[in-house]
Each structure stands twice: as C-alpha cells, then as structure tokens.
Amino acid sequence: YKINRLHLHLTDAAGWRIEIKKYPLLTEFAAWRTDANWKTWWNGGRKYLRFDEPGASGGYYTQDDIREIVEYARQHFITIIPEIEMPAHSEEVLAAYPQLSCAGEPYKNADFCIGNEETFTFLENVLTEVMALFPSEYIHIGGDEAGMAAWKTCPKCQKRMKDEHLSHVDELQSYLIHRIEKFLNDHGRRLLGWDEILKGGLAPNATVMSWRGEEGGITAVTSGHRAIMTPGGYCYLDSYQDAPYSQPEAIGGYLPLKKVYSYNPVSTSLSAEQAKLVYGAQVNLFTEYVPTPEHVEYMLYPRTLALAEVAWSAPERKSWPDFHARALKAVTDLQAKGYHTFDLKSEIGSRPESLQPLTHLALGKKVIYNAPYNSSYAAQGDVTLTDGIRGDWTY
C-alpha cells in the first residue's frame, strides 16, 4: 500500500510511553495512571501512580523495544517519526518533575515553564536519547494546544519575555520552538510540529503538520516551508466510520471511507512551486477510545488505505467506484491474514435523513443569532437552520 511513515505520539497527559534513562520517574511514575479507561481517568481527577502501587495502569516502551520496532520498520521500508510533546500536553511530566512547571507543584499546569532554563536542559536531554534510538530525519515536537495562561503570571516566564524582548505570550512558544529547532538542526535533524508552531513566528527550517484544517499547511508552504497535510475533517480516524449506533464508542464525528478518499492534500490555490512543498499526507489515530490492538486495526483499515492512495495518486486518476471495489477485496485479504478490519461490505453509510430535503415556513429566511454558534459545528453558517438540509451522522 506504499505506506512509508509511522508517526508515534509517545507522550501526552494520558501517559509517558518511552524509557528515558536520565529521567527514571518518567517510566516509574508518569507512565502509570489510576484507571485503564481513559474517559474514567480524564473525568475522575487525572492522577498518576507509581508503577508498583495497587491499581496502577499503563506501560511504556523500553529502549530495547524501540530498537526492535525501528529495525522491524526498516526491514519493511517504513521510517518511524517519534513525537515528544512540548510545551503543552505535559501533565504527566510535570506530575513527575513539578519543578519544570510554572507553579512548581504537580497537577497545576499542563505547559512547561518557558522561563525556567531547567526546562530546556530536560527537553534536550530527552531528545538526545530519542535521537539515539530513531534515525528519522524528522523529530516531531508537538507544539499544539498550549494553554499559556500560567505564562502570563509566571515571574520566570515574564522575565524571559523581558530579556528576549517578547511582547506576547505566543512568542514564548515560538522562542521554545526556535531553540529546540536549533538543537535538532545541530544534530542533523529537522523539526516537525503541529500547525500551532506558526504562532509567534515559525522557526527557520520547521515543517508544519496541518491538522486544524488546511490553513496552517497553506500558510507554511506559501512562506517557503514544508508541510504535511492531515486535516481533522479528512484524516482523524478516531471518528466514527459508520452510523454511530452501529459502532464502538468513538471520540465523535463521522468520517467514512468515501470522505477520506475524497481528500486532495494539494490545495488548488497553490502554485506549482508551492505545491512541491506539500511533502505528504497522514492519517491519525488517537486512542483515548481505542483500548485494544484489535480495535486499533478496526479503526485503521480500510480508511488508511484510502489516504495512502490519495497521497500517491494524481487527483484526475482517482476513481471512487474502482477504489471501493479494490477496498472490499483488500478487507477480505486483510481479514484472511488475521487483521480485525471494519466490515466494509456491511457499511450502513450516510444518515438517510441527510438526503431528504426539509420544507418548512422558515425556508430561506434570515436568522439573527444572539450568541455566536460553535465554530466546530458551523455546518452551512448563518443559513444552517433555514436551508432545508438535514445533518449527517456528524451533526
């Protein structure tokens, strides 16, 4: 299927998943939480435990595990790209090493303290061990969803802003990204990050992974940077792939095979030269609602195959009927090899009501909104309530 990259999201609030010898608490404490069920844990206090305490749930890859995985991938012509989250999504680190947070206490912050020089010592030490394990050209540093609230009142962060002549807290994230990029570049690696790394000014050689739609990727390539396209509406496989009532619990949304296949990673707004900077496309599967390896396979296949074909095919050569027929066969072949795929031949498909127009007295009338609607569910914008169109499984 010509899938040639595996991006491993190795750290997040739910647990630290890679052995770092210089910081043993990452695997003795930050890798273990109070409940195996993510939703129960997330809604129930979000606490961590030592690995040897009763009820501890979690785990991690040893460095020997990583070497074995990297070698297996190499034999199958796949490069593994590791991700170490910074500056946000770091609750687990800051519970184990609270001195790296603005508060200096566990369970207070999710973001590293950018004003603390020890933060950079920690991150560089971690990345040094990571680079020794992964030969990938790219090292992914996260960069998404930083809260930044603590930085506004943290004396160390405010001093950093003054010393570096920064005018907004967004620039603190940019400061961190620039420093980490230089460190990676000095070691012969490229920095890759989610599209929030554009905030405050993009690091000189950074590659942007565009997940909040395509805008971040387009901004990157039009300014001469590389981009990887992975917009949530087409590429996040933790959404339902069929009618939600027929599927295991998922994070929400509706992303069927056909929609993944419809994606074009290279925007028609780009020039030929800019298009060359779109280096690829990627599907993502976050596993908060995916508790077993079998469930992972179910969510991945066959939708991953659709993105693989999209990434390697010129848009004019794509044919949904042809791909769908081949996907049915691919599912049969994968199941024969022991994979637990989605049963494509039994797909329910779009919500029937979404294909039936609705007639009512307000059809086409202007709607006045007293409060803004949630942009995540914008649908058809101001005319959504009066356009006569019913929603699909997403909304």
Residue ranges and their predicted role:
Residues 14-16, 88, 147, 199, ...:
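Surface-exposed, flexible loop/turn segments at secondary-structure boundaries
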Residues 1-189:
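Substrate-binding cleft of carbohydrate-active enzyme catalytic domains
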Residues 354-395:
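Disordered, acidic Ser/Thr/Pro-rich linker "stalks" and the adjacent N-terminal cap
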Residues 22, 108, 204, 277, ...:
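Residues that flank catalytic or metal-binding motifs in active/ligand-binding sites
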Residues 68, 77, 120-138, 145, ...:
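Substrate-binding groove of N-acetylhexosamine-processing glycoside hydrolases
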Residues 17-19, 91, 150-152, 202, ...:
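Generic domain-boundary/flexible-linker signal
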Residues 14, 30, 36-40, 149, ...:
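Short, low-complexity intrinsically disordered segments
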Residues 10, 285, 371:
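Residues that line or immediately flank small-molecule/substrate-binding pockets and catalytic motifs
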